[in-house]
Amino acid sequence: MLNIFKNIRPFTSYCLYDWANSPFSTVVITFVFASYFEKAIVGDPEKASIMWGWAISFSAILIAIFSPFIGRHIDKNFSHKFWLILFTFISSVGAALLWFAYPIESSVVFVLSILVISNLSFELGGVVYNSLIPNFAIKNKIGEISGKAWAAGYLGGIVCLVIILFGFIQTESPLFGINKDNAANIRVAGPFVALWFILF
């Protein structure tokens, strides 16, 4: 197995990054916060779905605009580490700020703003992350290595989601003494994802 890598340590770090960042997509974008936004903040599933979709679409447009410039810049200046840390920091802070997404309609603009900014940073971080693989992988094994990292990310997203669901949301006694007032046991998913991202 080791012969498919130039260096096993960068490969491990590469997989751990995928393990660390996937919960953002799983918990914030797809499951927990999307559902919370729909049911607790907006209260109208159809309206909430449209707003959530527009926010994701807007961030996707920004990603398409900025990605080529970011890619060109980091390739020219070899500043991969700086930009990866910056985008990771921004998306982590965005996830953490979702703690303040109280279950009231006035939270709509706040949540959607955080969603656009953090998803933009998350995806741009992915651009930088994907550009790193040729630095340590043998050329004809890049696909295999990318697949292993994706698997690690998929697993990380599931593990984090399970912890949040059964440790905070679907339990009478949420972890760390978190109560259910103002949906604190759901809002904590944001900071938990941020902590997961930073720790790994």
Annotate each language-model stretch with its function:
Residues L2-I63, V109:
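Helix-loop boundary and gating motifs at the non-cytosolic
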Residues T30-A40, G157-A183:
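Transmembrane alpha-helix termini and helix-breaking/packing motifs in multi-pass membrane transporters
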Residues E46-I50, A137-W150, I186:
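Loop-to-transmembrane helix entry/capping segments in MFS-fold secondary transporters
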Residues S49-I74, V93-G94, I158-L161:
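Central cavity-lining transmembrane alpha-helices of secondary-active solute carriers
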Residues I63-A64, N119, E123, G143-I169, ...:
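Glycine-rich segments within core transmembrane alpha-helices of 12-TM secondary carriers
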Residues A64, I85-S106:
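C-terminal ends and interior cores of transmembrane alpha-helices
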Residues I74-I90:
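Cytoplasmic membrane-interface "Motif A"-like loop-to-helix N-cap segments
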Residues F122-I138:
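Intracellular juxtamembrane helix-capping segments at the cytosolic ends
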